[in-house]
Amino acid sequence: VISNQEESKYDVPQGVFQIGQGMAAPTLMTWGQPEHHERYLPKLVSGEEIWCQLFSEPAGGSDLAALRTKAEKEGDDWIINGQKIWTSGAHYSDYGILVVRTDPNVAKHKGLSYFFLDMKSPGVEIKPIKQLTGGAGFNEVYFTDVRIPDSQRLGEVGQGWQVALTTLMNERAAIGGGGGGVNVDLAYKI
């Protein structure tokens, strides 16, 4: 909330850091390893790296249990195939937080795993969705044989639902704090 209020004072566009600072950072802090904290958190907090959230899919919308994007283990890596939609800011993000299906043979909520990935990885294709206004804040993101190391997994394999709940709990605070920033901004301008 404080970060959003300060950004608003200096006309930083609303929402640019909400996913990284408000959702990815708390998830990394809760579920990440010390090396994740050292490498990613400083650049998240400083705004040097922008993050997006890769959760919603065309067939299931925001119903995570219905997602179809899959990851298959190959040695020390995972191969990701599938599609996400309505991804805010993917076209300018450096990293993304991603929930995928790693086990199709168990209950839907139990077959999920949670990763983060470099949005410039080979096989990641980002297509902005043009709005009526001409802008494109949302994107479709396609994954074709995207290889990511197991070290970019948060939580255990099959624990993606629990990790995603951490993200979603913080999403409410991040979005709510954005409104507080706007209110502070208006107070300064009045």
Name what the model sees in each region:
Residues 1-48, 88-95, 171, 183:
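Internal helix-loop-helix
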Residues 59-67:
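Active-site-adjacent elements of ketosynthase-type condensing enzymes
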Residues 60-61, 85-90, 132-133:
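Glycine-rich phosphate/pyrophosphate-binding beta-alpha loops
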Residues 69-72:
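A structural signal for short hydrophobic beta-strand segments in well-ordered beta-sheet cores
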Residues 81-127:
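A short core secondary-structure module
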Residues 123-190:
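Glycine-rich beta->alpha junctions and the first turn(s) of the following alpha-helix
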